[in-house]
Regions:
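All-alpha prenyltransferase/terpene-synthase fold signal
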Residues: 1-344
Length: 344
């Protein structure tokens, strides 16, 4: 198992892309808390069943920015918290997130996660599902140990909402009758709910009051929506090294994301027939991904998706208007910009 300090870099490195500077600044501001969170993650991955820490360490070693736990840590400190409860809750948030990744990769039959072989590709589907269950259980142990019914309500509700979002995505898969509102319901559930809860519990442990908790919940929700919109755009616009997974996975899986919806509705009858064949009937040839990329580019669906994301990022920033100016507040504002800069 890796030492805790290896889990995340909290300082900018020469290899960091410019758009990552915002997250590096946020990480630096909560560096001591983040190190304590990393230690808690390692400690709580421990199990006498050797496969559990081995598989969990594999996905942890694959990297990731620890954005969600950083949001919990930063939200608590923004609200003036001086205790340590937020550290365990940040680890809880990361366990929920990691469990969903393990389950998602099995459902999606993904071979890559963050540029490395996915856990299911290395350890198998059964092990990935069961270790994901273990991490969910660990997360709930941490909630109970915290002792706050408010925290338990927020994070358990988020876990249920994530599952609902994933099921809704399954229902809408291969369905071009899905509208933009339904698509947004999917990403609110599967992605944004945990962003929102991560921020909200930071305010709750600080005892800042309902207004602050609601503002941070809104910040996290809109940040998460923007993040997922950009993620869905990148699946049709990024290279594999940047994306960390195979480009075009959403297309091959028949996922109905906003770039596809926009291109489909703007397309000619011939173009719509292409989308019906490849997405609805899942009849895809070796040249179809390239044609899909060309249609999405023709109708500027990536640009339109990023424009939608920018609107949610601005809304996230507006949610922080009631907090006094500080380096932490600025870092959270910059984190919203980071979500957009990933697409540039």
């Amino acid at each position: 198992m890796q030492p805790s300090g290896a889990l995340i870099s909290v300082e900018p490195t020469e290899a960091a892309r410019p758009e990552e500077d915002a997250l590096n600044r946020l990480a630096a501001l909560v560096s001591a808390d983040l190190e304590a969170c990393n230690q808690a993650i390692v400690a709580r991955m421990a199990s006498p069943v050797a496969l559990i820490p081995a598989l969990a360490a594999h996905i942890v070693a694959a990297g990731g920015k620890r954005l969600r736990p950083m949001l919990t840590l930063a939200a608590a400190r923004l609200c003036g918290y001086r205790g340590t409860r937020h550290v365990a809750l940040a680890a809880c948030v990361e366990f929920i997130h990691t469990a969903t990744l393990l389950h998602d990769d099995v459902v999606d039959e993904s071979a890559l996660r963050r540029g490395l072989a996915s856990a299911n590709a290395v350890f198998g589907n059964k092990a990935s599902v069961l270790v994901g269950d273990f991490l969910f259980a660990r997360a709930f142990q941490l909630m109970v140990e915290d002792g706050s019914l408010d925290v338990l309500a927020i994070l358990s509700c988020a876990a249920a909402t994530i599952a609902e979002g994933e099921v809704l995505q399954l229902i809408t898969q291969n369905d071009l009758a899905t509208d933009e509102a339904r698509y947004l319901d999917v990403i609110r559930g599967k992605t944004a709910a945990l962003f929102s809860a991560a921020c909200q519990v930071g305010a709750v442990v600080a005892g800042k009051g309902e207004a602050a908790a609601a503002a941070l919940a809104r910040y996290g929700l809109d940040l998460g929506i923007a993040f997922q919109l950009v993620d869905d755009a990148l699946d049709y616009a990024a290279d594999q090294a940047l994306l960390g997974k195979t480009v075009g996975d959403d297309f091959r899986e028949g996922k109905v994301t906003l770039p596809v919806l926009l291109a489909y509705h703007a397309g000619s009858p011939e173009e719509r027939a292409f989308w019906q064949r490849t997405i609805v009937r899942s009849e895809q040839g070796e040249d179809d991904l390239a044609h899909a990329l060309a249609l999405i580019a023709r109708h500027r669906a990536i640009e339109a998706t990023i424009t939608r994301a920018a609107g949610f990022a601005r809304s996230a920033q507006e949610a922080l208007a009631g907090f006094a100016a500080s380096p932490l507040r600025q870092a959270l504002l910059d984190a919203a910009d980071y979500t957009l800069n990933r697409a540039r």
